[in-house]
C-alpha cells in the first residue's frame, strides 16, 4: 500500500516520557498496522528535572511516580504537574505552540492517541479543532477518532478561556484494572466528556498493556474509523455470545438444545417494526440456522469463504461493511438486529457504534465463555470477563427481554465438570 493512502495518527506521550519512548511502547500496534497507518510521535517541549518536577501539591501527584521508570533523556512533559493544582486553570502555551508547528509540518491527522497526561492534551486539542478559529491555528480539521490510554480530562485554557468541554467523535478508552496512579473516578472524567465512548478494561496498571490485551480491538477501531465513512445504523444492534461447545455427548447435546431454544426465543421475539435480522459468519450460521424461524432474516458474512449451499431467506455479504450497508438500506423494514459470531465479528460489532446490548452466557463466577479461547477473548474483550464492573439489567428486565423466566441451565466445562450457565445482559456505557 502506498504511503499516500495511509491514515495518520498523532500520538501524545505521557508525563516524564518522550515521543521516542512512546513509539517503543506502541511497537506492537505500529507493526500490526504498518501497511495502513503512519504514527507520529512528537516530544513535549518541557524539559523536566526530577528534583524540581516531582513535587507535591498537585491533584495528580501520582503522575510523578513515572520518574522512577523513565531515563533522564526521556523526561519531557507538556506542562509541569505542579503547575496544575486542583483549584488552578492552566493554559499550556508552549504545548499548543509546539503542536501547532508540528501539525503544520507533519499533518493534518486522521486520529489522535494519548497516554496519561497526553490524553488530557489530546482531548482538549480534539475539542479545540472543532472550532474554525483553532482549526486554522493548528492547521488541523476535526479528528475522526481518538484513543486514550489511562486517561483523564480537565479543561485547558486557550487564549485565556475554556472553549469546549465535550468531544463529539468516536473514542476508545483503555483503562487498567489495577491502575493506582489514576482512580476510576478520575478516568471517568474523560469517558463522560466523550459523547461516543467505548471503554475496555485491561488486566494491567497505569501503562500501555501487553499486546494481547489491546492491539486487536485498537486496530479494529482505527481501521473502522480511519479508512472511510461506513454505514451508520440508527437501530440498536445486540450481541449474542453463545457458550463454547466442548464435546458432543448426549448430555451435552441436550444442554446445547436448551441454549438453542433460549437464543431462538431471543431472536424470534416479534417486533412491530419489521423482520428481525441476525448477522453471523458461516460457521455460526451453519450451527444455528435450524433455530432461525420465519421471523428472522439471516445476514451471513462470508469473509472469503464459499457457502456449501445457498439457503433461502439468507443474504450473503463478503464483509462486515457490506452487512452494515445492507442494514442501512433496509432498516425501515427491519425489527431487531442481532450479531452472533466469532471474536472478529464480536469486536467489530462492539466498536462500530452499533451495539447497545450484550447478551452473554456465563458460568456461575461470571466468567465469559466463548467460541474462541479464553486467552484470546479476555485480551480483546476483558470487560465481559469482569462483568461486575459493568452496568447490568435487573432480572425482571432480562426476563422481559428474553421472553422467559428461566435464566440458568446446566452445562459442562472443558474437563467435563458440570457448571451452571447464566444468561446476563449488559448495557453499553
Curated annotation (Swiss-Prot):
InterPro entries: AB_hydrolase_fold, DHFR-like_dom_sf, FSH-like_dom, LovG
Protein name: Uncharacterized hydrolase C22A12.06c
Cited Gene3D superfamilies: alpha/beta hydrolase, Dihydrofolate Reductase, subunit A
Subcellular location: Cytoplasm; Nucleus
Major location (coarse): cytoplasm
A GO cellular component annotation in the UniProt record: cell division site
Family: Belongs to the AB hydrolase 3 family.
An example Gene Ontology molecular-function term: serine hydrolase activity
Domain of life of the organism encoding this protein: Eukaryota
Catalytic residues as annotated in Swiss-Prot or TrEMBL: 116, 179, 206
Keywords tagged on the record: Cytoplasm, Hydrolase, Nucleus
EC annotation from Swiss-Prot or TrEMBL: 3.1.-.-
Amino acid at each position: 500500500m502506498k504511503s499516500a493512502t495511509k491514515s495518520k495518527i498523532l500520538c501524545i506521550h505521557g508525563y516524564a516520557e518522550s515521543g521516542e519512548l512512546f513509539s517503543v511502547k506502541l511497537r506492537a500496534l505500529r507493526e500490526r498496522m504498518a501497511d495502513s497507518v503512519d504514527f507520529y510521535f512528537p516530544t513535549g517541549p518541557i524539559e523536566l528535572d526530577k528534583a524540581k518536577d516531582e513535587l507535591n501539591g498537585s491533584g495528580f501527584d501520582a503522575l510523578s511516580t513515572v520518574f522512577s521508570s523513565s531515563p533522564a533523556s526521556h523526561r519531557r512533559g507538556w506542562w509541569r504537574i505542579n503547575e496544575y493544582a486542583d483549584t488552578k486553570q492552566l493554559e499550556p502555551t508552549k504545548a499548543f505552540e509546539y503542536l501547532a508547528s508540528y501539525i503544520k509540518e507533519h499533518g493534518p491527522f486522521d486520529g489522535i492517541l494519548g497516554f496519561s497526561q497526553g490524553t488530557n492534551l489530546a482531548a482538549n486539542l480534539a475539542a479545540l479543532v472543532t472550532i474554525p478559529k483553532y482549526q486554522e491555528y493548528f492547521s488541523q480539521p476535526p479528528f475522526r477518532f481518538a484513543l486514550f490510554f489511562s486517561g483523564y480530562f480537565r479543561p485547558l485554557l486557550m487564549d485565556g478561556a475554556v472553549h469546549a468541554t465535550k468531544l463529539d467523535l468516536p473514542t476508545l478508552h483503555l483503562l487498567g484494572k489495577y491502575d493506582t496512579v489514576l482512580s476510576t473516578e478520575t478516568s471517568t472524567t474523560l469517558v463522560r466528556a466523550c459523547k461516543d465512548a467505548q471503554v475496555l478494561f485491561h488486566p494491567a496498571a497505569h501503562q500501555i498493556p501487553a499486546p494481547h490485551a489491546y492491539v486487536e480491538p485498537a486496530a479494529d477501531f482505527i481501521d473502522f474509523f480511519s479508512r472511510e465513512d461506513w454505514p451508520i445504523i440508527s437501530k440498536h444492534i445486540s450481541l449474542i455470545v453463545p457458550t463454547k461447545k466442548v464435546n458432543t455427548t448426549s448430555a451435552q447435546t441436550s444442554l446445547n438444545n436448551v441454549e438453542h431454544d433460549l437464543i431462538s426465543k431471543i431472536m424470534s421475539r416479534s417486533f412491530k417494526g419489521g423482520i428481525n435480522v441476525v448477522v453471523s459468519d458461516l460457521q455460526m450460521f451453519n450451527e444455528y440456522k435450524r433455530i432461525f424461524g420465519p421471523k428472522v432474516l439471516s445476514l451471513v458474512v462470508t469473509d472469503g469463504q464459499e457457502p456449501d449451499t445457498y439457503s433461502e431467506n439468507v443474504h450473503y455479504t463478503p464483509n462486515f461493511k457490506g452487512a452494515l450497508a445492507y442494514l442501512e438500506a433496509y432498516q425501515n423494514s427491519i425489527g431487531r438486529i442481532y450479531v452472533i459470531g466469532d471474536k472478529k465479528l464480536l469486536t467489530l460489532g462492539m466498536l462500530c457504534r452499533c451495539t447497545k446490548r450484550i447478551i452473554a452466557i456465563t458460568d456461575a463466577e461470571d466468567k465469559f465463555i466463548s467460541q474462541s479461547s479464553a486467552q484470546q477473548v479476555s485480551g480483546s474483550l476483558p470487560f465481559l470477563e469482569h462483568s461486575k464492573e459493568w452496568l447490568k439489567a435487573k432480572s425482571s428486565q432480562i426476563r422481559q427481554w428474553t421472553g422467559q423466566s428461566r435464566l440458568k441451565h446446566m452445562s459442562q466445562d472443558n474437563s467435563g465438570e458440570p457448571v451452571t450457565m447464566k444468561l446476563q445482559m449488559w448495557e453499553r456505557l
